[in-house]
């Protein structure tokens, strides 16, 4: 008989793989569970036990990480990023992103696209900078 811990670790690995393949498709957690051949409650218990987070939180973390990467590394308009990430429109994407990060996608992009520390120049001045 297989070790229960190893089985749970394998299910979590398979879940993460499915998330990687389908996070842009906005699957419901029950669909991931069905694909894994288990029920929603078992998937939820395994994720909480192994990661401290629910399956939905793990999916949203992956989607948020991809959104941040695209905002940081592409000049694409929000509408395009929203479409690429499976949102029906830029407004829904903005709402999701703001709920997850406490800032709008535009504000996030403005912060991460500044040259390093540009906004901190005034704060760094010390006695040596005096005339």
Please describe what each predicted stretch is.
Residues 33, 82-83, 94:
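The alpha-helix within a helix-turn-helix
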Residues 43, 92-97:
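Short hydrophobic/aromatic patch on the recognition helix
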């Amino acid at each position: 008989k297989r070790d229960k811990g190893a089985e749970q670790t394998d299910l979590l690995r398979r879940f993460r793989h499915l998330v990687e393949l389908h996070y842009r498709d906005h699957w419901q957690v029950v669909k991931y569970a069905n694909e894994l051949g288990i029920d929603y409650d078992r998937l939820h218990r395994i994720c909480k036990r192994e990661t401290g987070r629910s399956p939905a939180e793990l999916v949203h973390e992956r989607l948020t990480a991809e959104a941040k990467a695209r905002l940081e590394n592409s000049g694409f308009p929000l509408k395009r990023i929203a479409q690429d990430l499976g949102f029906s429109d830029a407004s829904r994407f903005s709402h999701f992103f703001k709920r997850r990060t406490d800032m709008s996608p535009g504000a996030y992009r403005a912060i991460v696209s500044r040259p390093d520390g540009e906004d901190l120049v005034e704060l760094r001045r010390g006695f040596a900078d005096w005339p």
